[in-house]
Design a protein with these regions (language model features):
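N-terminal interaction modules that seed assembly of large macromolecular complexes
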Residues: 1-50
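Residue-level recognition of alpha-helical structural elements
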Residues: 4-7, 31, 52, 73, ...
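Short, hydrophobic/amphipathic alpha-helical patches that form generic packing surfaces
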Residues: 13-20, 37-44, 65, 86, ...
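Long, charge-patterned amphipathic interaction tracts in eukaryotic proteins
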Residues: 34-72
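Residue-level signal for secondary-structure boundary elements
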Residues: 47-50, 68-71, 75, 96, ...
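A charged, amphipathic interaction segment
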Residues: 56-107
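Glycine-rich, aromatic-bearing surface loops/beta-hairpins
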Residues: 89-152
């Protein structure tokens, strides 16, 4: 499994992908102990049909906490958020959870982009710019998270 410490954003996206995979193909869980364990967790947590594992929610919460801290201490980071925020607000307004955090919106954007690319659906240049900005933001957050947790 992807390591949360290595790249927390990729870890969350990986968990989301596994959740969708196991919902679509629950019989595939028998192929590995990792998948079997995740499917069992999904059932125990009541998210067999929709929702996210506590593992993903905790990691997202950790990213959001770091995000809030960096908004207070890193002027370039705050400027990057201010730059992307209008596009994130548009994205949020088109979801069933318009009150999601900016970090969850960035992750959702990247996850949805991955799904569109798998379906070979073209993505507009305007959207690609937002994807790039969200990726840079998550990359910075993940690197900061990694740097702070490397000693553990």
């Amino acid at each position: 499994m992807k390591s949360k410490k290595e790249n927390i954003a990729e870890y969350i996206l990986y968990l989301w992908q596994l959740e969708d995979y196991l919902r679509a193909f629950p019989e595939k869980a028998a192929e590995s102990q990792e998948l079997m364990d995740l499917l069992m967790m999904m059932h125990e947590e009541g998210i067999a049909e929709e929702g996210h594992l506590d593992l993903a929610k905790i990691a997202l919460s950790e990213m959001e906490d770091l995000h809030e801290e960096l908004l207070e201490t890193e002027a370039p980071y705050k400027a990057a958020i201010i730059h992307i925020e209008p596009q994130l607000n548009i994205l949020k307004s088109k979801t069933d959870c318009p009150t999601m955090s900016d970090i969850e919106a960035c992750l959702t954007l990247l996850y949805q982009t991955m799904m569109l690319r798998l379906q070979q659906i073209e993505i507009s240049e305007e959207t690609n710019i937002v994807i790039h900005d969200a990726t840079q933001l998550l990359r910075f957050l993940s690197k900061t998270y990694y740097d702070r947790n490397i000693e553990e």
